[in-house]
Structure formats: C-alpha cells, structure tokens
C-alpha cells in the first residue's frame, strides 16, 4: 500500500493515503485489545468504514458493535472512540471532512495511554 505518511501510535498505526484542503483519507489499524482515546474534534467530521475485523464504537456514550462493510458517521464535536476486543486487528478507512485536519484538533476526554493535556 502506498501512503504519504505513516505514524505508529500506542493502539496501532495510521496511514495518510490522501490529503487535500477539504478532506483527508486515512487507513487506520487498531491492534487486538487496544482502543483509541475517547475524543472529539472541533473542526472536522469523520466517516469510518470497517474493512477488516469487528469493532466496538462509542459515540456520545452509545456503544454499538460494527463489522466489515459497516459505515459510521461521526459529526463534528461528537465524542467518539473505537476499540478492538478481538484477537485480530481492526482496519477502517477514515474520511475526514472539514476545514482543518491537524492532529492537534484531537480533544481527548479519556485515554488509556495518558495523553490527556
């Protein structure tokens, strides 16, 4: 897979596939037993499509399970998290839509890796 950026995180990794002024496209891999922080974004919404594995997604306190082929809409400022409770990695495609896509637009509410500022 060709990407323009790869970054390792405590929960797995992400690959930036495409980056434009009005959208950003990522492939995100969540390792078994890991989860992202419970977070929100002020300047972007996100659309996730699960392409591999099964995930547990929390949006505004509501928890739901998703599988390959499912799509999830995360509105701007909605608190959200994805987690992998299985033994195989979860892979999803994330489309970010908005006016700014910097990693500093992540406001963490809860984080297993002590990254709350």
Language-model segment annotations:
Residues 2-8, 81, 85-117:
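Double-stranded beta-helix
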Residues 37-38, 57-58, 74, 80-87, ...:
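Short beta-strand His + acidic residue motifs that chelate non-heme Fe in jelly-roll/DSBH
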Residues 61-79:
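Short acidic-glycine-tyrosine-enriched beta hairpin
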Residues 32-34, 43-44, 62, 78-79, ...:
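A generic "binding-loop/recognition-motif" signal
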Residues 3-40, 44:
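A short glycine-rich, His/Asp/Glu-containing loop-to-beta-strand
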Residues 36, 62-64, 105:
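Short beta-strand segments
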Residues 43-56, 60-61:
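Glycine- and acidic-residue-biased ligand/ion/polar-headgroup-sensing regions
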């Amino acid at each position: 897979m060709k990407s323009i950026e790869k970054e390792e995180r405590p929960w797995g990794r992400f690959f930036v596939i495409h980056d434009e002024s009005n959208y950003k496209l990522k492939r995100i891999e969540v390792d078994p037993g890991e989860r992202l922080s419970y977070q929100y974004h002020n300047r972007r919404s996100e659309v996730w499509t699960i392409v591999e594995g099964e995930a547990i997604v929390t949006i505004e306190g509501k928890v739901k399970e998703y599988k390959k082929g499912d799509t999830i809409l995360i509105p701007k400022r909605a608190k959200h998290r994805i987690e992998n409770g299985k033994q195989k990695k979860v892979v999803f495609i994330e489309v970010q839509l908005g006016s700014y896509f910097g990693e500093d637009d992540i406001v963490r509410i809860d984080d297993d890796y002590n990254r709350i500022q």
